[in-house]
């Protein structure tokens, strides 16, 4: 489950005054949740037995298979991640020294639905695997990109100088630039930009471009999953479809139940369907580049 969670992008989650970056993955019989406010990191991985006991404790008037509870829970969590509303009326959180308690309150078939994520402080290895190592790789990649851009700018300056030596004249003065000085640029950037970024108080999380970079550095390192054995339990470990149907039954006193009051089974979920709750829609097609116009004559 942790390997599957590692490959998911980080998304932002705002609950009252608390701002987190998080990722979550559901299967038909378990889930894994990871949250961080960049001061601490918390996680919970729950199996079927824990989920069943917690569902009975929190929702005494609802009866359903574990897969149905997880399906409905996923449909609550998914729209909240990275949304503008960010679940102000759905989620609440309480911190203690031992855990971060993330509580969910919703409605299902006219009845209240409750859930609690009991997140423990993540281990150092988890923090390193999901944040420290990827961030180090991202930093190295950005440094390499910066060096390539500096080389490109120097080549452009040399190209412009050659045009000027040939007698070319710039027709638009507003496009005139100074010769690129890498050392001067770095000093200016550190003095003017970096301090402003550190003091901006921006919510934790990655921009779209940084998230793509995170995905790129994670992809080659994420372990591949061994082929699942053909057993009766293999289906319960497959990622759950976001649109899985939900089958719940309201509990009634025993003397009022009839022999035909059995709980209907949830519909089967295709093996190819995936419930990555931090799924990002595919990027749109890039616009065609404009034809370059000459600046010298």
Curated annotation (Swiss-Prot):
One of its GO terms (molecular function) is DNA end binding. The keyword Methyltransferase does not apply. InterPro entries: NHEJ_factor, XLF-like_CC, XLF-like_N, XRCC4-like_N_sf. Changing residue 111 to A: Does not affect interaction with xrcc4. Supports end joining in xlf-depleted egg extract. Does not bridge DNA in pulldown experiments with xrcc4. Homodimer. Interacts with xrcc4; the interaction is direct and is mediated via a head-to-head interaction between N-terminal head regions. Component of the core long-range non-homologous end joining (NHEJ) complex (also named DNA-PK complex) composed of prkdc/DNA-PKcs, lig4, xrcc4, xrcc6/Ku70, xrcc5/Ku80 and nhej1/xlf. Residues 220-286 are annotated as: C-terminal tail. Residues 287-297 have a biased composition (Basic residues). Keywords: DNA damage, DNA repair, DNA-binding, Nucleus. GO terms for biological process: double-strand break repair via nonhomologous end joining; telomere maintenance. Pfam families: XLF (PF09302), XLF_CC (PF21928). One of its GO terms (cellular component) is DNA ligase IV complex. Belongs to the XRCC4-XLF family. XLF subfamily. This is Non-homologous end-joining factor 1. Coiled coil: none annotated. Residues 232-255 have a biased composition (Polar residues). It comes from the Eukaryota. PANTHER family: NON-HOMOLOGOUS END-JOINING FACTOR 1. DNA repair protein involved in DNA non-homologous end joining (NHEJ); required for double-strand break (DSB) repair and V(D)J recombination. It is also involved in telomere maintenance. Plays a key role in NHEJ by promoting the ligation of various mismatched and non-cohesive ends. In some studies, has been shown to associate with xrcc4 to form alternating helical filaments that bridge DNA and act like a bandage, holding together the broken DNA until it is repaired. Residues 1-131 are annotated as: Globular head. The keyword DNA-binding applies. The coiled-coil region mediates homodimerization. The Leu-lock (Leu-111) site inserts into a hydrophobic pocket in xrcc4. Residues 263-286 have a biased composition (Low complexity). The record marks 111 as: Leu-lock. It is found in: Nucleus. A motif (XLM) lies at residues 287-297. It comes from Xenopus laevis (African clawed frog).
């Amino acid at each position: 489950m942790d390997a599957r969670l590692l490959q998911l992008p980080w998304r932002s989650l705002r609950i009252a005054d608390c701002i987190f970056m998080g990722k979550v993955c559901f299967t038909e019989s378990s889930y894994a949740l990871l949250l961080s406010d960049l001061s601490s990191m918390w996680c919970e991985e729950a199996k079927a037995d824990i989920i069943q006991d917690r569902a009975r404790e929190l929702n005494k008037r609802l009866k359903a298979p574990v897969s149905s509870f997880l399906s409905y829970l996923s449909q609550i969590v998914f729209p909240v991640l990275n949304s503008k509303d960010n679940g102000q009326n759905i989620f609440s959180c309480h911190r203690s020294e031992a855990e971060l308690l993330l509580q969910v309150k919703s409605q299902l078939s006219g009845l209240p639905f409750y859930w609690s994520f009991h997140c423990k402080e993540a281990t150092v290895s988890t923090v390193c695997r999901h944040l420290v190592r990827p961030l180090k790789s991202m930093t190295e990649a950005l440094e390499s990109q910066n060096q390539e851009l500096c080389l490109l700018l120097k080549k452009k300056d040399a190209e412009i100088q050659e045009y000027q030596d040939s007698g070319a004249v710039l027709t638009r003065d507003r496009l005139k630039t100074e010769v690129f000085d890498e050392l001067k640029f770095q000093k200016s950037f550190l003095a003017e930009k970096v301090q402003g970024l550190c003091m901006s108080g921006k919510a934790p999380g990655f921009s779209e471009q940084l998230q793509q970079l995170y995905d790129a550095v994670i992809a080659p390192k994420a372990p591949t999953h061994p082929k699942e054995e053909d057993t009766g339990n293999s289906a319960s470990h497959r990622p759950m479809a976001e649109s899985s149907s939900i089958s719940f039954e309201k509990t009634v006193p025993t003397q009022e139940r009839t022999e035909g009051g059995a709980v209907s089974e949830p519909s089967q979920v295709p093996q190819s369907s995936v419930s990555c709750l931090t799924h990002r829609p595919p990027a749109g097609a890039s616009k065609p580049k404009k034809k370059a116009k000459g600046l010298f004559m």
